[in-house]
Amino acid sequence: MEGAELAGKILSTWLTLVLGFILLPSVFGVSLGISEIYMKILVKTLEWATIRIEKGTPKESILKNSASVGIIQRDESPMEKGLSGLRGRDFELSDVFYFSKKGLEAIVEDEVTQRFSSEELVSWNLLTRTNVNFQYISLRLTMVWVLGVIVRYCVLLPLRVTLAFIGISLLVIGTTLVGQLPDSSLKNWLSELVHLTCCRICVRALSGTIHYHNKQYRPQKGGICVANHTSPIDVLILTTDGCYAMVGQVHGGLMGIIQRAMVKACPHVWFERSEMKDRHLVTKRLKEHIADKKKLPILIFPEGTCINNTSVMMFKKGSFEIGGTIHPVAIKYNPQFGDAFWNSSKYNMVSYLLRMMTSWAIVCDVWYMPPMTREEGEDAVQFANRVKSAIAIQGGLTELPWDGGLKRAKVKDIFKEEQQKNYSKMIVGNGSLS
Protein backbone atom coordinates (compact mmCIF):
# COMPACT_ATOMS: atom_id res chain seq x y z
CA MET A 1 0.00 0.00 0.00
CA GLU A 2 2.79 2.40 0.90
CA GLY A 3 4.45 1.75 -2.46
CA ALA A 4 1.20 2.46 -4.29
CA GLU A 5 0.69 5.68 -2.35
CA LEU A 6 4.24 6.81 -3.11
CA ALA A 7 3.80 6.05 -6.81
CA GLY A 8 0.52 7.96 -6.79
CA LYS A 9 2.13 11.01 -5.18
CA ILE A 10 5.02 10.95 -7.66
CA LEU A 11 2.59 10.69 -10.59
CA SER A 12 0.36 13.49 -9.31
CA THR A 13 3.38 15.73 -8.67
CA TRP A 14 4.69 14.97 -12.17
CA LEU A 15 1.38 15.79 -13.85
CA THR A 16 1.01 18.97 -11.77
CA LEU A 17 4.43 20.18 -12.90
CA VAL A 18 3.65 19.33 -16.52
CA LEU A 19 0.28 21.09 -16.33
CA GLY A 20 1.51 24.19 -14.52
CA PHE A 21 4.85 24.82 -16.21
CA ILE A 22 4.28 23.52 -19.74
CA LEU A 23 0.66 22.82 -20.73
CA LEU A 24 -0.98 26.03 -19.53
CA PRO A 25 1.74 28.33 -20.93
CA SER A 26 1.59 26.52 -24.28
CA VAL A 27 -2.21 26.89 -24.42
CA PHE A 28 -1.87 30.67 -24.08
CA GLY A 29 1.21 30.86 -26.30
CA VAL A 30 3.52 32.21 -23.60
CA SER A 31 6.91 31.07 -22.34
CA LEU A 32 8.19 30.97 -18.77
CA GLY A 33 11.78 31.19 -19.98
CA ILE A 34 12.67 27.59 -19.12
CA SER A 35 13.31 26.59 -22.74
CA GLU A 36 15.46 29.69 -23.28
CA ILE A 37 17.67 28.77 -20.29
CA TYR A 38 17.90 25.18 -21.54
CA MET A 39 18.95 26.35 -25.02
CA LYS A 40 21.64 28.67 -23.64
CA ILE A 41 23.15 25.83 -21.59
CA LEU A 42 22.94 23.49 -24.59
CA VAL A 43 24.62 25.97 -26.95
CA LYS A 44 27.49 26.53 -24.51
CA THR A 45 27.93 22.77 -24.03
CA LEU A 46 28.03 22.04 -27.77
CA GLU A 47 30.47 24.92 -28.37
CA TRP A 48 32.76 23.51 -25.67
CA ALA A 49 32.49 20.00 -27.15
CA THR A 50 33.31 21.30 -30.64
CA ILE A 51 36.46 23.02 -29.36
CA ARG A 52 37.55 19.86 -27.52
CA ILE A 53 37.02 17.73 -30.62
CA GLU A 54 38.92 20.16 -32.87
CA LYS A 55 41.85 20.22 -30.44
CA GLY A 56 41.98 16.45 -30.15
CA THR A 57 41.48 15.58 -33.83
CA PRO A 58 44.28 15.85 -36.43
CA LYS A 59 43.65 18.46 -39.13
CA GLU A 60 43.91 15.81 -41.85
CA SER A 61 41.12 13.83 -40.21
CA ILE A 62 38.92 16.91 -39.89
CA LEU A 63 39.30 17.67 -43.58
CA LYS A 64 38.70 14.07 -44.54
CA ASN A 65 35.60 13.62 -42.43
CA SER A 66 34.08 17.04 -42.94
CA ALA A 67 30.49 16.72 -44.04
CA SER A 68 30.90 19.74 -46.28
CA VAL A 69 33.43 17.87 -48.41
CA GLY A 70 31.93 15.19 -50.65
CA ILE A 71 33.45 11.89 -51.60
CA ILE A 72 34.35 13.26 -55.01
CA GLN A 73 35.17 16.69 -56.37
CA ARG A 74 32.60 17.48 -59.02
CA ASP A 75 32.93 19.52 -62.16
CA GLU A 76 29.62 21.40 -62.17
CA SER A 77 30.10 22.83 -65.67
CA PRO A 78 27.35 22.17 -68.24
CA MET A 79 27.69 19.60 -71.02
CA GLU A 80 28.72 22.16 -73.63
CA LYS A 81 31.63 23.43 -71.53
CA GLY A 82 32.61 19.97 -70.32
CA LEU A 83 32.99 18.64 -73.84
CA SER A 84 34.69 21.69 -75.31
CA GLY A 85 38.12 20.60 -74.07
CA LEU A 86 37.71 17.09 -75.45
CA ARG A 87 36.27 17.54 -78.91
CA GLY A 88 37.79 19.25 -81.89
CA ARG A 89 35.25 18.30 -84.55
CA ASP A 90 31.53 17.55 -84.63
CA PHE A 91 32.13 14.14 -83.09
CA GLU A 92 35.07 12.39 -81.52
CA LEU A 93 35.41 9.11 -79.72
CA SER A 94 36.90 11.03 -76.79
CA ASP A 95 33.38 12.31 -76.01
CA VAL A 96 32.89 8.95 -74.32
CA PHE A 97 35.31 10.04 -71.58
CA TYR A 98 33.01 12.89 -70.52
CA PHE A 99 29.93 10.67 -70.22
CA SER A 100 31.90 7.92 -68.49
CA LYS A 101 33.19 10.45 -65.96
CA LYS A 102 29.69 11.76 -65.28
CA GLY A 103 28.36 8.22 -64.98
CA LEU A 104 31.00 7.24 -62.43
CA GLU A 105 30.33 10.41 -60.43
CA ALA A 106 26.64 9.53 -60.29
CA ILE A 107 27.39 5.97 -59.16
CA VAL A 108 29.80 7.04 -56.42
CA GLU A 109 27.81 10.01 -55.11
CA ASP A 110 24.83 11.36 -57.03
CA GLU A 111 23.14 14.58 -55.98
CA VAL A 112 19.66 13.06 -55.64
CA THR A 113 19.69 9.95 -53.41
CA GLN A 114 21.84 11.65 -50.77
CA ARG A 115 18.93 14.06 -50.23
CA PHE A 116 16.87 11.12 -48.93
CA SER A 117 19.20 10.36 -46.01
CA SER A 118 20.09 12.38 -42.93
CA GLU A 119 22.48 15.28 -43.35
CA GLU A 120 26.00 14.65 -42.07
CA LEU A 121 27.31 17.13 -39.52
CA VAL A 122 30.64 18.92 -39.63
CA SER A 123 30.97 18.66 -35.85
CA TRP A 124 29.61 15.95 -33.57
CA ASN A 125 26.63 17.14 -31.49
CA LEU A 126 26.95 14.52 -28.72
CA LEU A 127 24.13 12.39 -30.16
CA THR A 128 24.97 8.72 -30.67
CA ARG A 129 23.36 8.45 -34.11
CA THR A 130 25.42 11.33 -35.52
CA ASN A 131 28.64 9.87 -34.14
CA VAL A 132 29.85 8.79 -37.60
CA ASN A 133 33.32 10.28 -37.54
CA PHE A 134 33.90 10.56 -33.81
CA GLN A 135 36.81 8.91 -32.08
CA TYR A 136 37.83 8.94 -28.42
CA ILE A 137 39.19 12.38 -27.50
CA SER A 138 39.22 12.67 -23.72
CA LEU A 139 37.65 11.29 -20.56
CA ARG A 140 35.99 14.65 -19.87
CA LEU A 141 34.22 14.69 -23.25
CA THR A 142 33.13 11.09 -22.79
CA MET A 143 31.67 11.91 -19.37
CA VAL A 144 29.75 14.85 -20.86
CA TRP A 145 28.33 12.51 -23.51
CA VAL A 146 27.26 9.99 -20.82
CA LEU A 147 25.62 12.79 -18.83
CA GLY A 148 23.82 13.89 -21.99
CA VAL A 149 22.47 10.37 -22.55
CA ILE A 150 21.14 10.30 -18.97
CA VAL A 151 19.48 13.72 -19.35
CA ARG A 152 17.93 12.91 -22.73
CA TYR A 153 16.63 9.43 -21.90
CA CYS A 154 15.86 9.68 -18.18
CA VAL A 155 14.62 13.28 -17.86
CA LEU A 156 13.62 14.73 -21.22
CA LEU A 157 12.17 11.58 -22.83
CA PRO A 158 9.54 10.86 -20.11
CA LEU A 159 8.54 14.52 -20.10
CA ARG A 160 8.29 14.69 -23.88
CA VAL A 161 6.35 11.42 -24.16
CA THR A 162 3.87 12.73 -21.59
CA LEU A 163 3.40 15.98 -23.52
CA ALA A 164 3.13 14.21 -26.88
CA PHE A 165 0.52 11.79 -25.51
CA ILE A 166 -1.52 14.67 -24.08
CA GLY A 167 -1.19 16.77 -27.24
CA ILE A 168 -2.11 13.99 -29.68
CA SER A 169 -4.95 12.71 -27.47
CA LEU A 170 -6.45 16.19 -27.12
CA LEU A 171 -6.14 16.72 -30.89
CA VAL A 172 -7.91 13.45 -31.76
CA ILE A 173 -10.63 13.86 -29.11
CA GLY A 174 -11.07 17.59 -29.66
CA THR A 175 -11.38 17.46 -33.45
CA THR A 176 -13.73 14.46 -33.21
CA LEU A 177 -16.04 16.34 -30.83
CA VAL A 178 -15.90 19.60 -32.80
CA GLY A 179 -16.67 17.61 -35.95
CA GLN A 180 -20.08 16.69 -34.53
CA LEU A 181 -21.19 20.33 -34.53
CA PRO A 182 -23.09 21.79 -37.51
CA ASP A 183 -21.15 24.07 -39.84
CA SER A 184 -21.01 27.52 -38.29
CA SER A 185 -18.60 30.25 -37.24
CA LEU A 186 -18.51 28.68 -33.75
CA LYS A 187 -17.36 25.34 -35.19
CA ASN A 188 -14.63 27.06 -37.22
CA TRP A 189 -13.43 29.00 -34.16
CA LEU A 190 -13.34 25.87 -31.96
CA SER A 191 -11.54 23.92 -34.70
CA GLU A 192 -8.84 26.59 -34.98
CA LEU A 193 -8.51 26.72 -31.18
CA VAL A 194 -8.07 22.94 -30.91
CA HIS A 195 -5.54 22.78 -33.76
CA LEU A 196 -3.54 25.74 -32.46
CA THR A 197 -3.46 24.58 -28.83
CA CYS A 198 -2.60 20.94 -29.55
CA CYS A 199 0.13 21.84 -32.05
CA ARG A 200 1.73 24.15 -29.49
CA ILE A 201 1.72 21.35 -26.92
CA CYS A 202 3.28 18.93 -29.43
CA VAL A 203 6.00 21.46 -30.30
CA ARG A 204 6.81 21.74 -26.58
CA ALA A 205 7.10 17.94 -26.57
CA LEU A 206 10.02 18.31 -28.98
CA SER A 207 11.61 21.23 -27.10
CA GLY A 208 10.89 23.23 -30.22
CA THR A 209 12.47 26.65 -30.62
CA ILE A 210 11.03 28.41 -33.66
CA HIS A 211 12.08 31.78 -35.04
CA TYR A 212 9.45 33.36 -37.31
CA HIS A 213 10.58 36.08 -39.71
CA ASN A 214 8.54 38.63 -41.70
CA LYS A 215 5.23 37.94 -39.96
CA GLN A 216 3.59 40.66 -42.04
CA TYR A 217 3.64 38.16 -44.93
CA ARG A 218 1.77 35.39 -43.10
CA PRO A 219 -0.60 33.52 -45.47
CA GLN A 220 -4.05 35.08 -45.65
CA LYS A 221 -7.43 33.36 -45.90
CA GLY A 222 -8.31 32.24 -49.39
CA GLY A 223 -4.64 31.88 -50.34
CA ILE A 224 -2.29 28.95 -50.89
CA CYS A 225 0.74 28.45 -48.65
CA VAL A 226 3.56 26.40 -50.20
CA ALA A 227 6.69 25.35 -48.33
CA ASN A 228 9.66 23.03 -48.61
CA HIS A 229 9.10 19.68 -46.88
CA THR A 230 11.42 17.98 -44.39
CA SER A 231 9.16 16.26 -41.91
CA PRO A 232 5.54 15.83 -40.78
CA ILE A 233 6.37 18.27 -37.99
CA ASP A 234 6.53 21.01 -40.64
CA VAL A 235 2.77 21.13 -40.08
CA LEU A 236 3.24 21.60 -36.32
CA ILE A 237 5.84 24.31 -36.88
CA LEU A 238 3.55 26.35 -39.14
CA THR A 239 0.28 25.69 -37.27
CA THR A 240 1.83 26.95 -34.03
CA ASP A 241 1.70 30.43 -35.60
CA GLY A 242 -1.58 30.10 -37.51
CA CYS A 243 -4.12 27.54 -38.73
CA TYR A 244 -4.29 25.99 -42.20
CA ALA A 245 -6.42 23.63 -44.23
CA MET A 246 -3.96 20.92 -45.24
CA VAL A 247 -3.47 18.85 -48.37
CA GLY A 248 -1.49 15.64 -48.16
CA GLN A 249 -0.97 11.95 -48.77
CA VAL A 250 -3.14 9.43 -46.91
CA HIS A 251 -1.16 7.58 -44.23
CA GLY A 252 -1.78 4.57 -42.06
CA GLY A 253 -0.92 3.88 -38.43
CA LEU A 254 -0.72 6.75 -35.95
CA MET A 255 -0.59 9.37 -38.71
CA GLY A 256 -3.75 7.90 -40.25
CA ILE A 257 -5.63 8.13 -36.94
CA ILE A 258 -4.67 11.79 -36.60
CA GLN A 259 -5.64 12.55 -40.21
CA ARG A 260 -9.08 10.93 -39.91
CA ALA A 261 -9.80 12.89 -36.73
CA MET A 262 -8.59 16.24 -38.07
CA VAL A 263 -10.67 16.09 -41.24
CA LYS A 264 -13.86 15.90 -39.16
CA ALA A 265 -13.35 19.41 -37.81
CA CYS A 266 -11.59 21.16 -40.71
CA PRO A 267 -11.79 20.76 -44.52
CA HIS A 268 -8.39 19.12 -44.93
CA VAL A 269 -7.85 17.15 -48.16
CA TRP A 270 -6.19 13.73 -47.92
CA PHE A 271 -5.60 11.75 -51.11
CA GLU A 272 -3.86 8.66 -52.47
CA ARG A 273 -1.00 9.75 -54.72
CA SER A 274 -1.29 6.71 -57.01
CA GLU A 275 -5.01 7.25 -57.73
CA MET A 276 -5.63 9.52 -60.73
CA LYS A 277 -9.27 10.12 -59.72
CA ASP A 278 -8.06 11.37 -56.33
CA ARG A 279 -5.80 13.89 -58.03
CA HIS A 280 -8.68 15.29 -60.10
CA LEU A 281 -10.84 15.46 -56.98
CA VAL A 282 -8.10 17.33 -55.12
CA THR A 283 -7.82 19.91 -57.92
CA LYS A 284 -11.58 20.46 -57.84
CA ARG A 285 -11.64 20.78 -54.04
CA LEU A 286 -8.75 23.26 -54.08
CA LYS A 287 -10.43 25.49 -56.66
CA GLU A 288 -13.62 25.53 -54.59
CA HIS A 289 -11.64 26.28 -51.43
CA ILE A 290 -9.70 29.29 -52.72
CA ALA A 291 -12.89 30.73 -54.23
CA ASP A 292 -14.11 31.34 -50.66
CA LYS A 293 -11.98 34.11 -49.14
CA LYS A 294 -13.33 33.31 -45.66
CA LYS A 295 -11.72 29.86 -45.53
CA LEU A 296 -8.33 29.10 -44.02
CA PRO A 297 -5.29 29.25 -46.30
CA ILE A 298 -4.36 25.91 -47.84
CA LEU A 299 -1.02 24.38 -46.83
CA ILE A 300 0.70 22.38 -49.59
CA PHE A 301 4.14 20.80 -49.84
CA PRO A 302 4.68 20.68 -53.63
CA GLU A 303 7.76 18.42 -53.42
CA GLY A 304 5.43 15.57 -52.48
CA THR A 305 7.96 13.89 -50.18
CA CYS A 306 10.35 14.67 -47.33
CA ILE A 307 13.81 15.99 -48.28
CA ASN A 308 16.68 16.22 -45.78
CA ASN A 309 16.56 20.04 -45.50
CA THR A 310 19.70 20.61 -47.52
CA SER A 311 17.85 21.11 -50.81
CA VAL A 312 14.59 21.97 -52.51
CA MET A 313 13.56 19.52 -55.22
CA MET A 314 11.06 19.83 -58.06
CA PHE A 315 7.70 21.41 -57.21
CA LYS A 316 4.74 19.56 -58.74
CA LYS A 317 2.84 21.90 -61.03
CA GLY A 318 -0.66 20.92 -59.83
CA SER A 319 -0.63 23.39 -56.95
CA PHE A 320 0.19 26.22 -59.34
CA GLU A 321 -2.48 25.48 -61.96
CA ILE A 322 -5.51 26.30 -59.85
CA GLY A 323 -4.92 30.05 -59.68
CA GLY A 324 -5.04 32.14 -56.54
CA THR A 325 -2.29 33.84 -54.58
CA ILE A 326 0.73 31.79 -53.55
CA HIS A 327 2.31 32.53 -50.16
CA PRO A 328 5.81 30.97 -50.15
CA VAL A 329 7.33 29.86 -46.84
CA ALA A 330 10.91 28.67 -46.31
CA ILE A 331 11.65 26.31 -43.40
CA LYS A 332 15.23 25.63 -42.32
CA TYR A 333 16.09 23.34 -39.39
CA ASN A 334 19.34 23.55 -37.43
CA PRO A 335 20.76 19.98 -37.53
CA GLN A 336 23.19 20.73 -34.71
CA PHE A 337 20.44 20.19 -32.12
CA GLY A 338 18.56 17.34 -33.76
CA ASP A 339 17.77 15.80 -37.12
CA ALA A 340 14.21 16.69 -38.16
CA PHE A 341 14.30 14.73 -41.45
CA TRP A 342 11.85 11.81 -41.68
CA ASN A 343 13.22 8.91 -43.71
CA SER A 344 9.85 7.21 -44.19
CA SER A 345 11.40 4.23 -45.98
CA LYS A 346 13.49 3.47 -42.88
CA TYR A 347 11.40 4.57 -39.88
CA ASN A 348 7.69 4.43 -39.12
CA MET A 349 6.04 7.39 -37.42
CA VAL A 350 6.42 6.10 -33.84
CA SER A 351 10.13 5.28 -34.32
CA TYR A 352 10.68 8.67 -35.91
CA LEU A 353 9.00 10.49 -33.02
CA LEU A 354 11.12 8.59 -30.49
CA ARG A 355 14.26 9.65 -32.35
CA MET A 356 13.06 13.24 -32.25
CA MET A 357 12.22 13.06 -28.55
CA THR A 358 15.68 11.76 -27.69
CA SER A 359 17.38 14.61 -29.55
CA TRP A 360 18.50 17.77 -27.80
CA ALA A 361 15.85 20.01 -29.33
CA ILE A 362 14.22 21.02 -32.61
CA VAL A 363 15.41 24.46 -33.67
CA CYS A 364 14.28 26.04 -36.91
CA ASP A 365 13.73 29.30 -38.76
CA VAL A 366 10.56 30.07 -40.70
CA TRP A 367 10.57 32.84 -43.29
CA TYR A 368 7.23 34.15 -44.54
CA MET A 369 7.75 35.63 -47.99
CA PRO A 370 5.85 38.21 -50.08
CA PRO A 371 2.86 36.71 -51.94
CA MET A 372 3.43 35.69 -55.55
CA THR A 373 1.01 35.40 -58.47
CA ARG A 374 1.30 33.87 -61.90
CA GLU A 375 2.64 36.35 -64.43
CA GLU A 376 1.21 36.91 -67.89
CA GLY A 377 2.49 34.31 -70.35
CA GLU A 378 3.91 32.16 -67.55
CA ASP A 379 2.83 28.52 -67.45
CA ALA A 380 2.37 26.46 -64.26
CA VAL A 381 5.81 24.82 -64.50
CA GLN A 382 7.61 28.16 -64.85
CA PHE A 383 5.61 29.61 -61.97
CA ALA A 384 6.42 26.59 -59.77
CA ASN A 385 10.12 26.91 -60.57
CA ARG A 386 10.08 30.63 -59.75
CA VAL A 387 8.48 29.98 -56.35
CA LYS A 388 10.89 27.11 -55.68
CA SER A 389 13.89 29.32 -56.47
CA ALA A 390 12.65 32.02 -54.11
CA ILE A 391 12.22 29.51 -51.26
CA ALA A 392 15.65 27.96 -51.89
CA ILE A 393 17.38 31.35 -51.84
CA GLN A 394 15.59 32.51 -48.69
CA GLY A 395 16.26 29.28 -46.79
CA GLY A 396 19.85 28.89 -47.96
CA LEU A 397 19.00 25.57 -49.63
CA THR A 398 20.36 23.97 -52.80
CA GLU A 399 17.93 24.10 -55.71
CA LEU A 400 17.63 20.83 -57.64
CA PRO A 401 15.54 20.15 -60.77
CA TRP A 402 14.94 16.49 -59.90
CA ASP A 403 11.58 15.00 -58.89
CA GLY A 404 11.35 13.90 -55.26
CA GLY A 405 9.35 10.94 -56.57
CA LEU A 406 12.70 9.34 -57.47
CA LYS A 407 12.75 8.36 -53.81
CA ARG A 408 10.23 5.64 -54.64
CA ALA A 409 10.36 5.24 -58.44
CA LYS A 410 12.90 4.69 -61.20
CA VAL A 411 14.23 7.53 -63.32
CA LYS A 412 11.84 8.32 -66.17
CA ASP A 413 13.07 7.82 -69.72
CA ILE A 414 12.31 11.48 -70.45
CA PHE A 415 15.30 12.56 -68.31
CA LYS A 416 17.65 10.29 -70.25
CA GLU A 417 16.20 11.45 -73.56
CA GLU A 418 16.74 15.09 -72.58
CA GLN A 419 20.49 14.52 -72.16
CA GLN A 420 20.60 12.67 -75.48
CA LYS A 421 18.79 15.53 -77.22
CA ASN A 422 21.22 18.08 -75.78
CA TYR A 423 24.16 16.09 -77.10
CA SER A 424 22.50 15.71 -80.51
CA LYS A 425 21.92 19.46 -80.69
CA MET A 426 25.59 20.06 -80.01
CA ILE A 427 26.61 17.83 -82.91
CA VAL A 428 24.02 19.16 -85.36
CA GLY A 429 24.57 22.76 -84.24
CA ASN A 430 28.40 22.51 -84.40
CA GLY A 431 28.94 22.40 -80.64
CA SER A 432 26.19 24.78 -79.52
CA LEU A 433 23.06 24.04 -77.50
CA SER A 434 21.33 27.21 -78.69
Swiss-Prot record:
A motif (HXXXXD motif) lies at residues 229-234. It is a multi-pass membrane protein. The chain crosses the membrane at residues 14-34, 137-157, 161-181. The lineage of its organism: Eukaryota, Metazoa, Chordata, Craniata, Vertebrata. Belongs to the 1-acyl-sn-glycerol-3-phosphate acyltransferase family. Converts glycerol-3-phosphate to 1-acyl-sn-glycerol-3-phosphate (lysophosphatidic acid or LPA) by incorporating an acyl moiety at the sn-1 position of the glycerol backbone. Also converts LPA into 1,2-diacyl-sn-glycerol-3-phosphate (phosphatidic acid or PA) by incorporating an acyl moiety at the sn-2 position of the glycerol backbone. Protects cells against lipotoxicity. It comes from the Eukaryota. GO terms for molecular function: 1-acylglycerol-3-phosphate O-acyltransferase activity; glycerol-3-phosphate O-acyltransferase activity. Pathway: Glycerolipid metabolism; triacylglycerol biosynthesis; Phospholipid metabolism; CDP-diacylglycerol biosynthesis; CDP-diacylglycerol from sn-glycerol 3-phosphate: step 1/3. Widely expressed. Expressed in liver, kidney, testis, brain, heart, skeletal muscle, thyroid, prostate, thymus and placenta. Also expressed lung and adipose tissue. PANTHER family: GLYCEROL-3-PHOSPHATE ACYLTRANSFERASE 3 (PTHR23063:SF10), PHOSPHOLIPID ACYLTRANSFERASE (PTHR23063). It comes from Homo sapiens (Human). The HXXXXD motif is essential for acyltransferase activity and may constitute the binding site for the phosphate moiety of the glycerol-3-phosphate. This is Glycerol-3-phosphate acyltransferase 3. GO terms for biological process: CDP-diacylglycerol biosynthetic process; glycerol-3-phosphate metabolic process; phosphatidic acid biosynthetic process; regulation of TOR signaling; triglyceride biosynthetic process. It is found in: Endoplasmic reticulum membrane. Its EC number is 2.3.1.15, 2.3.1.51. The modification Phosphoserine is found at residues 68, 77.
